[in-house]
Amino acid sequence: MASRPDTDDYLNLFLNDVPLMDVRAPVEFAKGSFPSAENAPLMNDEERHRVGICYKEKGQDKAIELGHQLVSGDIKAQRIEAWKRFVAQHPEGYLFCFRGGLRSRLTQQWIRDSGIDYPLVKGGYKALRRFLIDSLEAQIESGQFRILSGRTGTGKTRVLMQLPNPVDLEGLANHRGSSFGRQVTPQPSQIDFENRLGVAMLKARHQAGGPIYLEDESRLIGRCALPETLRARMSESPLLILEQAMEERIAIIRADYVEGMLASYRARDGEDAGWLNFRDYLLSAIDRIRKRLGGERYQKLRNLMLQALDQQEANGSLEGHHGWIEALLTDYYDPMYDYQLTQKQGEILVRGGPEVITEWARSRTST
């Protein structure tokens, strides 16, 4: 393999999803890494913990000595094999540790001893993260945003992805943004979410260009928090208001939150367990907004939901779900959205259905 130099071209790494081998410990990786990174640690969590204590008590030289003792023999051979597999699968990639220092150099040397030259990222995770955060803040400050808004169930995410330069905040957070919004797979950590957002914004700026379209979101998407600076820009940015008839909204919610979520739970957990977990998902979602609904309204909606679930389990019919969906939209989500819309500072550019919104945006890609 021809030797490649180490790199500090962070923009290229992120724009091109260059594979990255993160040699930090699993606990560090779990707190946050990058979309194109895989964890292939030099030390496991326990080894890192022991070396860290040694460093504090006895200094760097003794810590390095202990590290070599802990990662030796078969353990060392297994780690090197894991790195070699990554290199074979991703010859165009790079490796990194926290600061681009000792762990990166040692990993690089051990791979080189096996006859392979593999470059590292200068400055490591810390430099990559700083580059992303600085780039994101600069783009939030100077970028042009347009916000796709609309009542719950209008299918905003579907329409967003048909617009010229979208960034899907809910996709990045792996959450649909309401009490019913969780997915069967977990959300990313806050740091992972911020890193994903930073990469998505870089691509929107450098690869597509023009105004960036975002879906209207509150501060929290599930447990992932939007940067306050982005929320402030979104609140004053121009709006596109997506409108749909009630029957269409009910159909969209049923497709996404009933049929889609049941299919996802069954794909993950099997037929019977999937049904039970789907049932728990719907009921826990209504339970989470119990206080905001008020006791009487909550009980009415929960009873409608239970009847719909019983009917679906008995004969597969989805018709019963229309009752609680329509009541939830009419009595809870619509009044809340209508109030929030009055608080918006941005100019309303266009109102209408999906075709109106997409045609308006596409006809103005150069403005």
Swiss-Prot record:
Residue ranges annotated for the Rhodanese domain, each copy included: 14-137
Catalytic residues (UniProt): 97 (s-selanylcysteine intermediate)
Matches recorded under PROSITE patterns: RHODANESE_3
E.C. number(s) listed in UniProt: 2.9.1.3
Catalyzed reaction equations: 5-methylaminomethyl-2-thiouridine(34) in tRNA + selenophosphate + (2E)-geranyl diphosphate + H2O + H(+) = 5-methylaminomethyl-2-selenouridine(34) in tRNA + (2E)-thiogeraniol + phosphate + diphosphate; 5-methylaminomethyl-2-thiouridine(34) in tRNA + (2E)-geranyl diphosphate = 5-methylaminomethyl-S-(2E)-geranyl-thiouridine(34) in tRNA + diphosphate; 5-methylaminomethyl-S-(2E)-geranyl-thiouridine(34) in tRNA + selenophosphate + H(+) = 5-methylaminomethyl-2-(Se-phospho)selenouridine(34) in tRNA + (2E)-thiogeraniol; 5-methylaminomethyl-2-(Se-phospho)selenouridine(34) in tRNA + H2O = 5-methylaminomethyl-2-selenouridine(34) in tRNA + phosphate
Entry's family note: Belongs to the SelU family.
Protein name: tRNA 2-selenouridine synthase
The organism of origin for this protein: Marinobacter nauticus (strain ATCC 700491 / DSM 11845 / VT8) (Marinobacter aquaeolei)
Gene name, Swiss-Prot/TrEMBL: selU
